[in-house]
Amino acid sequence: MGSLSGLRLAAGSCFRLCERDVFSSLRLTRSSDLKRINGFCTKPQESPRAPSRTYNRVPLHKPTEWQKKILVWSGRFKKEDEIPETVSLEMLDTAKNKMRVKISYLMIALTVVGCICMVIEGKKAAQRHESLTSLNLEKKARLREEAAMKAKTE
């Protein structure tokens, strides 16, 4: 009984070694054919095909009026008349990105100007002794007076 289990273990380890060697020598190629590395199994010979189309050119795009304005505003061209009939998509993307950056700089500048204006207005209000606390107290006093007047008339 003991020799049978030993034989089974030896056979299993031998099988695993062979399996590992077989699968390590096989690999998957692009056309999903199995190919043996050491050359015993080879891929079927295929006749070389001439490429049907070559894509050496950059795809061109006819810009719309809005895209032409973006190209001019981004500084790529001086006038709309200078823009060719077709431009590359990469050129349009670059112009759009430049415009995004310019617009974000403008928004940053407007935010800073707005903050400065609010600080100046706040200082002027402080000189007039206007604060949220004083305004709320005045409003509550006025509402109490109106409520008292309303209670007297009823």
Swiss-Prot record:
Entry keyword annotation includes Transmembrane helix: yes
Region (Required for proapoptotic activity): 76-102
GO process annotations (BP): cellular response to hypoxia; neuron apoptotic process; positive regulation of apoptotic process; positive regulation of release of cytochrome c from mitochondria
Transmembrane annotation, as ranges: 103-120
Family of the protein in this entry: Belongs to the UPF0389 family.
Function comment: Proposed to be involved in regulation of apoptosis; the exact mechanism may differ between cell types/tissues. May be involved in hypoxia-induced cell death of transformed cells implicating cytochrome C release and caspase activation (such as CASP9) and inducing mitochondrial permeability transition. May be involved in hypoxia-induced cell death of neuronal cells probably by promoting release of AIFM1 from mitochondria to cytoplasm and its translocation to the nucleus; however, the involvement of caspases has been reported conflictingly.
UniProt protein name: Protein FAM162A
Protein's organism: Pongo abelii
